[in-house]
């Protein structure tokens, strides 16, 4: 089996903050699923080739929003591959059957996403094939949470709190892509957890901006937002989130 060359070797760590020279906006942009740093230590765990692995990416979304710092808003970029660690999941959203030993304190329950192979440590690639031929060491799951997940969310939280301190409110723009077939007739899907994660004014302003550019926009269907939108979207606390 032929492996492609690592398309984006990272020289600056698994999570990168692109900070503006001067913060001029309450917005914080995040690109959680466009990471393409397929390091040798991660590739060693799977038998799938790089082409199959990369199908799980929201490819190059980070480049679409790369100008955010120039407009006064930070961009948090995950460079680790989503197929090995998904930051848009709760940290305990694990399928216990994937690992060589039980997690301490685990309740035995499993979310629908983890059961489908798409927990914080995914079991399946985008084409439905298993990523692993044997159970993973639980220590490897913890390593990924420590090295990838924790730094990502630490930076997102810090930037949102900094924006709130400056402007009285902060708005996380959680940036993703989608298959063309998943929302027929729509170019843009805005997710606000059905009104729970941001104010009506914020989503209305985003929708109007896209429509002025000629895009067809729908709300929440089929993507209302997952862990990130739900976790950070606290309008009553001055922190909002829009996917």
Give the ranges of each region predicted by the language model.
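N-terminal catalytic or cofactor-binding beta/alpha core of small enzyme domains
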Residues: 2-172, 177-243
């Amino acid at each position: 089996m032929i492996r492609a060359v690592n398309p984006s070797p990272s020289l600056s760590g698994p999570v990168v903050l692109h900070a503006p020279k001067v913060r001029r906006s309450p917005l914080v942009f995040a690109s959680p699923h466009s990471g393409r740093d397929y390091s040798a230590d991660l590739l060693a765990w799977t038998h799938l080739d790089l082409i199959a692995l990369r199908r799980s990416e929201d490819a190059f979304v980070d480049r679409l929003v790369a100008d955010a710092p120039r407009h006064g808003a930070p961009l948090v970029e995950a460079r680790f591959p989503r197929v090995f660690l998904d930051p848009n999941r709760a940290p305990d959203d694990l399928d216990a059957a994937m690992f060589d030993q039980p997690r301490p304190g685990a309740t035995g329950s499993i979310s629908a996403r983890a059961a489908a192979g798409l927990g914080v440590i995914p079991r399946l690639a985008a084409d439905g094939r298993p990523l692993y031929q044997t159970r993973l060491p639980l220590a490897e799951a913890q390593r990924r949470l420590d090295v990838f997940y924790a730094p990502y969310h630490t930076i997102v939280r810090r930037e949102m709190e900094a924006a709130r301190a400056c402007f009285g409110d902060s708005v996380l723009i959680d940036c993703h892509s989608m298959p063309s077939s998943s929302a027929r007739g729509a170019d843009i899907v805005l997710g606000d957890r059905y009104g729970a994660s941001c104010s009506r004014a914020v989503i209305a302003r985003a929708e109007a901006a896209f429509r002025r550019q000629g895009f067809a926009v729908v709300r929440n269907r089929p993507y209302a937002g997952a862990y990130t939108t739900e976790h950070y979207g606290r309008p009553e606390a001055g922190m909002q989130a829009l996917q």
